[in-house]
């Protein structure tokens, strides 16, 4: 998790920032599933994944728009 977050915030490319940010979700979900409170950890991981992916779509859209306008 630390390596992915370090790569996320030290990259020079917006696309790589987005990719590393999304890849950092996998270890976080594993942490929730492994050490969460027993009954609520599965729905909590689903909600975490859904809300994070849904809220990062505007970021991807803006990154794609800026890549088109920069060229």
Swiss-Prot record:
It comes from the Eukaryota. It catalyses: a ubiquinone + NADH + 5 H(+)(in) = a ubiquinol + NAD(+) + 4 H(+)(out). It is found in: Mitochondrion membrane. Keywords: Electron transport, Membrane, Mitochondrion, NAD, Respiratory chain, Translocase, Transmembrane, Transmembrane helix, Transport, Ubiquinone. Its EC number is 7.1.1.2. Its main location: mitochondrion. The chain crosses the membrane at residues 14-34, 46-66. The keyword Transport applies. GO terms for cellular component: mitochondrial membrane. Pfam families: Proton_antipo_M. It is an enzyme of class 7 (translocase). One of its GO terms (molecular function) is ubiquinone binding. Core subunit of the mitochondrial membrane respiratory chain NADH dehydrogenase (Complex I) that is believed to belong to the minimal assembly required for catalysis. Complex I functions in the transfer of electrons from NADH to the respiratory chain. The immediate electron acceptor for the enzyme is believed to be ubiquinone. Belongs to the complex I subunit 4 family. This is NADH-ubiquinone oxidoreductase chain 4. It comes from Artemia salina (Brine shrimp). The gene is ND4.
């Amino acid at each position: 998790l630390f390596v992915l977050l370090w790569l996320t915030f030290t990259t020079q490319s917006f696309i790589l920032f987005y990719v590393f940010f999304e890849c950092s979700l996998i270890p976080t979900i594993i942490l929730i599933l492994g050490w969460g409170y027993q009954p609520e950890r599965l729905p909590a991981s689903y909600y975490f994944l859904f809300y994070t992916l849904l809220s990062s779509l505007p970021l991807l859209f803006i990154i794609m728009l800026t890549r088109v306008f920069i060229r």
